[in-house]
Amino acid sequence: MRTYLYKLTSDRGGAPCAPPPRAGGDPLLTLSICKPAIRRTAQPGDRILGVTSHGLAATDGYPLESVIYAAVVAEGIEPREYYAQRSRFRSRPDCIYAFHQANGTLTHTGRTRLHDDRAYEARDIGRYPFYRNARTLLCTDFRYLGAGAVAIPAQLTRLRQIVQSLGQGHRVFDEKSPEAKELDALFKILWKLPSRFTPKVVEDEAYGHTPNRK
């Protein structure tokens, strides 16, 4: 089991995406855009920890060094399933691309402003024909806290130091990492809390930048 740690620069419901479930449905958190390196490599049973960045604290008032969401990966699925025309995920706010069976291409659906600039495609889905970044992570066991982000306890000193020094990338920890015990303790604390949900409708994220075109 590995734990992925990264900082969110925006939290408007696109990534992570965890809208309220339909009546009788089960809660689901997905990561289908942003953080392609995590989406490419995370496996079932791995954990993801998203924490507040200085930018998000400044723009949205989120508390610093706090957990916005934590999740356990249940499955990673390919774009031909997540973005299929009749996909069971089609109504989700982050299902913003369409897979065309005839030629194997992916295009933005155009039904939302979320990442509708083609500059996002390389990071979101990658290049045709392989679309290496188009993998989506499904998480049925999660805690999304949003603006109610929970501060990492002061006694978890090693973890707090790592979060303070973390930049735009991400860190990966395995069960033998010195931080493993603190991570386990944090997840136990978080799992005692009720989960919130992201908006049903997502207009756009608020990164304050657009990826450079390549």
State where each predicted segment sits.
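Compositionally biased, charged N-terminal/linker segments
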Residues: 1-43, 195-214
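Short edge-strand/loop segments of extracellular domains
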Residues: 72-78
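Eukaryotic short linear interaction motifs
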Residues: 13-14, 57-58, 78-81
